[in-house]
């Protein structure tokens, strides 16, 4: 009896291993081929396993996807969804925007990561239907083939360099005011190609170009993580790679989870948030970053207490050094890429009309009150409330808002403590005069 049980267990393990191996080998291909030596009894199970994982990740839609750079990690089980949420392939429910997971480089040590989609599953389905409908094709058309035939993509195929005219009409705030310097940075640091480093796209395959164009059209968040990495001091989580329509980045907890934090932690997070906005407004590269809107899910906190931008999809960038070419949204520039996940009628105002105060006003209106109200002794709380009132007014001038947030930052600095709860600056803060 025991030997029969062991034999059954060994057979099950062998079948599971073969399925995994086939998935790994087939990862970077968008077609399916079956090894001749695979036992016939395993064919349906392996085919079903492969199809399920491929469809969940969006690999069946490549190259209308984000990338394939981290697919091997998924199929070697070096990225695992947290708590093994589903059987066999460990696939979680499909209706979530992001997923907690664990990542390993050696299958021994693991660290938390976040796996996220650029838009919701519902929006992805709407987008795919729009692509098919654009040529009156059935709902199950080849979206990659349709996108490859568009006039915009044909221009991309011929282009040696990514220029502002190639991104005209795309809806992302990131491309609202593109400069050549910014677009060169995109190409030079694009992590989904093998030989990054050049401003020219000679080393890009047709698939590489379609993936980059698709990502820019749907959500530029992964591109921003790549070109402004946290390793260089930018307030962004680390981009680890993409597979299909999912990207993997270092894990953070969203800001809303800290609304009930202690006064010391609330003051520290609010101070960090203002410092982040300051670095986006004024930095060595002379880029002016601004938010078109904010919510608490756009900012996250690492385990060490450090605050970062968790979602960069609402970030616009203006090149103060080179100047920016306003992104015109005329009928001439609009195409299917303009309307994949947004209203085709969105109007973009002039780059010159974005005020310096914009991000500060949004944060003072929507985030800082949730962190700071009712947390401190009366005299201090009154000062904080007064500063918030000033910096949250839409009709205030840039100077008035900047002055109010500078005052608020000074108040918050005095409320920060130096202890192990704030590992990102401890024990260094013990030797800093400001503490």
UniProtKB/Swiss-Prot annotation:
Keywords, alphabetical: Glycoprotein, Secreted, Signal
Position of the signal peptide: 1-33
Taxonomic source organism: Mus musculus
Family statement: Belongs to the DIPK family.
Keyword set includes Glycoprotein: yes
Protein name: Divergent protein kinase domain 2B
Upper lineage: Eukaryota, Metazoa, Chordata, Craniata, Vertebrata
Localisation per UniProt entry: Secreted
InterPro entries on file: DIPK2A/B, FAM69_kinase_dom
Glycosylation sites: 102, 395
Entry-linked Pfam families: PIP49_C
GO cellular component: extracellular region
């Amino acid at each position: 009896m025991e030997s029969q049980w062991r034999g059954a267990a060994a057979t099950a393990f062998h079948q599971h291993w073969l399925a995994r191996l086939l998935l790994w080998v087939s990862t970077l291909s968008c077609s399916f081929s079956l090894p001749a030596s695979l036992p016939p009894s395993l064919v349906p199970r392996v085919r079903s396993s492969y199809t399920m994982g491929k469809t969940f990740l969006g690999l069946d839609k490549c190259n209308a996807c984000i990338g394939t750079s981290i697919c091997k990690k998924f199929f070697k089980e070096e990225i695992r969804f947290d708590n093994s949420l589903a059987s066999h392939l460990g696939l979680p429910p499909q209706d979530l925007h992001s997923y907690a997971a664990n990542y390993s480089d050696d299958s021994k040590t693991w660290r938390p990561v976040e796996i996220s989609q650029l838009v919701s599953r519902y929006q992805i389905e709407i987008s795919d239907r729009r692509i098919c409908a654009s040529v009156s094709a059935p709902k199950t058309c080849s979206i990659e083939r349709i996108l490859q035939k568009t006039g915009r993509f044909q221009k991309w195929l011929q282009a040696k360099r990514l220029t502002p005219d190639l991104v005209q009409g795309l809806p992302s705030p990131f491309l609202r005011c593109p400069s050549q310097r910014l677009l060169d940075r995109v190409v030079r640091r694009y992590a989904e190609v093998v030989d990054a480093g050049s401003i020219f796209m000679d080393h890009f395959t047709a698939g590489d170009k379609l993936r980059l164009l698709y990502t820019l059209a749907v959500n530029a968040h992964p591109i921003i993580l790549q070109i402004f990495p946290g390793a260089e001091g930018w307030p962004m989580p680390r981009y680890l790679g993409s597979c299909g329509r999912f990207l993997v980045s270092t894990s953070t907890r969203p800001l809303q989870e800290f609304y009930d934090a202690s006064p010391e932690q609330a003051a520290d997070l609010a101070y960090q948030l203002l410092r982040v906005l300051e670095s986006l407004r004024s930095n060595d590269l002379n880029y002016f970053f601004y938010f078109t809107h904010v919510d608490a899910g756009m900012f996250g906190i690492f385990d060490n207490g450090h605050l970062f931008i968790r979602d960069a999809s609402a970030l616009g960038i203006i090149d103060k050094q080179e100047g920016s070419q306003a992104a015109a949204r005329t009928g001439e520039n609009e195409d299917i890429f303009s309307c994949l996940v947004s209203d085709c009628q969105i109007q973009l105002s002039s780059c010159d009309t974005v005020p310096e105060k914009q991000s500060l006003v949004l944060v003072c209106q929507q985030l800082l009150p949730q962190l700071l109200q009712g947390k401190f002794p009366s005299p201090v709380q009154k000062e904080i409330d007064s500063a918030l009132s000033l910096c949250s007014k839409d009709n205030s001038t840039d100077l008035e808002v900047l002055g109010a947030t500078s005052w608020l930052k000074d108040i918050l600095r005095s409320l920060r403590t130096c202890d192990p709860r704030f590992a990102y600056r401890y024990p260094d803060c013990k030797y800093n005069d400001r503490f």
